[in-house]
């Protein structure tokens, strides 16, 4: 079969949770002998428009230039997706699978009605847009509402035209029910996201791993990796740690990732007297990320809003690390299955503080690292889950090339 997968970006270019799942699916299908085309934006503007790589035929379109609040940028992404497909893919595909709304809508306008169409909803588009303004004032929020409404209409249209709809958590399906109605939600098949267990090894000696990373030894090291934007809850984590420090507990926090909130977070860490206990590591590659998960005493996931799966929690558990998290979105589905007490009572700084103090005091239930990894492998192994997604996309009667 000839399959087109529409993604926000090509994961090796710009790693993210949704791009990872789209990439893994594409590589899996190509490994079965299918002809797989992956179309995505090129955020850097430096990649070739057409390239064959990883067994895939990659189509990348250049950055879309428009003002942030300009609603025309939505149609520009769709137009560019359609253009690169028309330019390079001369034969009609058999199947179209979307992992990103605008790119899927662009491809759907080209092939809809003639091919099998499937959509995986990683996060409802209007909520994703509005979540970017968590904690912001009304001056920033108000211009987003017309854009969010436009995305909502487009998403509903794409869902209606999809023969198969999947989501990566029960939480996401519940959001679909609230936003688009029960008649749409009942069509959504929940297939959990996954991690590549082979990429994440159980550490032999966490202290030695910290030393190799230049992290302090002899003190509990908390680790998180996030895009540094308000909805990720890092401001709340810093305020929680201020309370942990005031309570006399020792710790060191490493924050990997980058984003527009970084300067404000660094200033806040200074204002709270945390500079000696908090390290901003910046962007890290996947090899370094695996070593960081494995070296940490615990992984912290302080999400403030809209966590529709939580891939990084699964990756951390694949190294045997406990995950201390807020009960936001789908996180309880991922973390609660191994230990409900690893979840804070809510996503407030006080609740996060209390959870961290309990961990540092050794009063939370403990699990052997081997058991934590076994849980992650049983529930979220790429080997099984990507095959489930591919089956849903291709359909029960779809021929294998």
Predicted regions and their residues:
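Acceptor-binding helix/loop patch of EC 2.4 sugar-transfer enzymes
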Residues: 67-68, 115-156, 175, 198
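Short His-centered aromatic/hydrophobic patch
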Residues: 98-103, 121
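Acidic donor-binding loop of glycosyltransferase active sites
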Residues: 163, 294-308, 321
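Conserved donor-binding/catalytic core segment of Leloir-type glycosyltransferases
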Residues: 166, 216-232, 238-241
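Carbohydrate-associated surface elements
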Residues: 171, 194
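Short alpha-helical donor nucleotide-sugar binding micro-motif in glycosyltransferases
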Residues: 283-284, 291-296
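Short hydrophobic beta-strand element within catalytic cores of glycosyltransferases
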Residues: 313, 322-325
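Conserved acidic donor-binding segment of nucleotide-sugar-dependent glycosyltransferases
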Residues: 337-350, 357-364
């Amino acid at each position: 079969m000839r399959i087109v997968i529409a993604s926000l970006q090509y994961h090796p270019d710009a790693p993210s949770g949704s791009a990872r799942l789209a990439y893994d699916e594409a590589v899996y299908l190509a490994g079965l002998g299918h002809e797989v085309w992956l179309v995505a934006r090129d955020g850097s503007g430096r990649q070739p428009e057409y390239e064959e790589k990883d067994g895939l035929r990659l189509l990348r379109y250049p950055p879309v230039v428009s003002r942030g609040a300009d609603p025309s940028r939505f149609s520009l992404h769709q137009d560019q997706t359609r253009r690169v497909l028309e330019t390079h893919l001369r034969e009609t595909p058999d199947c179209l699978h979307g992992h990103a709304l605008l790119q899927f809508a662009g491809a759907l306008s080209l092939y809809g009605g003639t091919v099998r169409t499937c959509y995986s909803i990683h996060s409802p588009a209007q909520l994703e847009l509005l979540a970017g303004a968590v904690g912001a004032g009304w001056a920033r929020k108000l211009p987003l509402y017309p854009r969010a409404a436009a995305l909502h209409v487009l998403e509903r249209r794409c869902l209606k035209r999809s023969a198969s709809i999947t989501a990566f958590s029960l939480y996401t399906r519940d959001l679909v029910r609230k936003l688009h109605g029960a008649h749409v939600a009942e069509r959504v098949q929940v297939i959990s996201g996954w991690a590549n267990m082979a990429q994440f090894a159980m550490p032999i000696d966490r202290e030695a791993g910290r030393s190799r990373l230049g992290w302090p030894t002899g003190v509990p090291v908390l680790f998180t990796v996030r895009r540094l934007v308000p909805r990720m809850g890092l401001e709340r984590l810093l305020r929680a740690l201020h309370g942990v420090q005031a309570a006399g507990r020792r710790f060191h926090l490493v924050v990997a990732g980058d984003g527009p909130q970084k300067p404000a977070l660094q200033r806040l860490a200074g204002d709270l007297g945390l500079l000696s206990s908090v390290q901003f590591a910046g962007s890290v590659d996947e090899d370094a990320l695996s070593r960081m998960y494995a070296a940490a005493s615990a992984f912290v996931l302080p999400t403030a809003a809209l966590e529709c799966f939580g891939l990084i929690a699964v990756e951390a558990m694949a190294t045997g690390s406990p995950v201390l998290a807020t009960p936001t979105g789908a996180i309880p589905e991922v973390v609660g299955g191994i230990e409900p007490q690893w979840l804070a009572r809510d996503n407030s700084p006080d609740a996060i503080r209390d959870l961290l103090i309990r961990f540092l005091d050794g009063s939370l239930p403990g699990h052997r690292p081997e058991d934590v990894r076994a849980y992650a492998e049983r529930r979220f192994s790429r080997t099984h889950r990507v095959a489930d997604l591919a089956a849903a996309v291709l359909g029960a009667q779809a021929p294998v090339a």
